[in-house]
Design a protein with these regions (language model features):
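Bacterial N-terminal signal peptides
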Residues: 1-10
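Sec/Tat signal peptide C-region and signal peptidase I cleavage site
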Residues: 12-16
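Divalent metal-coordination and catalytic microenvironments
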Residues: 24, 46, 58
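N-terminal post-signal-peptidase region of extra-cytosolic proteins
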Residues: 27-34, 60-64, 72-77
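Beta-strand cores of secreted/periplasmic/IMS beta-sandwich domains, seen most often
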Residues: 34-52, 74-82, 86-90
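Histidine- and aromatic-enriched segments that form or immediately flank copper-ligand environments
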Residues: 51-71, 99-102
Length: 104
């Protein structure tokens, strides 16, 4: 009985840690959408699709990530569970390209 409880508890904990997946597209040196939303306390995985003809470097000091996405490709960025807030990210190769992650 104890073993069955541990297995169920482990399965529930593993599911609780599955990341929230957010898709972000970079097109014409703009983020689409420019504002994303995710719940507090959950890990996040950004799937970033770069439709530009040049590379983009998606970066965020607040979210602690930096990743180059080559032209015409996609990549993923993983973010730890967050507290509520509004977090900025940007394209370091094109500084006018700005976006936000809102965590209510």
């Amino acid at each position: 009985m104890l073993l069955a409880s541990l297995v169920v508890t482990s399965a529930i904990a593993a599911r609780a840690e599955e990341p929230v997946t957010l898709t972000l597209t970079i097109k014409d040196h703009r983020f689409e959408p420019a504002e994303l939303h995710a719940p507090a306390g959950k890990p996040i995985m950004f799937v970033v699709k770069n439709l530009n003809t040049s590379a983009s470097e998606i970066e965020s000091d607040a979210l602690h990530f930096e990743k180059v996405i080559p032209a015409g490709s996609e990549g993923t960025v993983h973010v730890r569970p967050l507290s509520p807030g509004r977090y900025n990210f940007f394209d370091d190769f094109h500084h006018a390209t700005q976006g936000y992650l809102v965590v209510p």
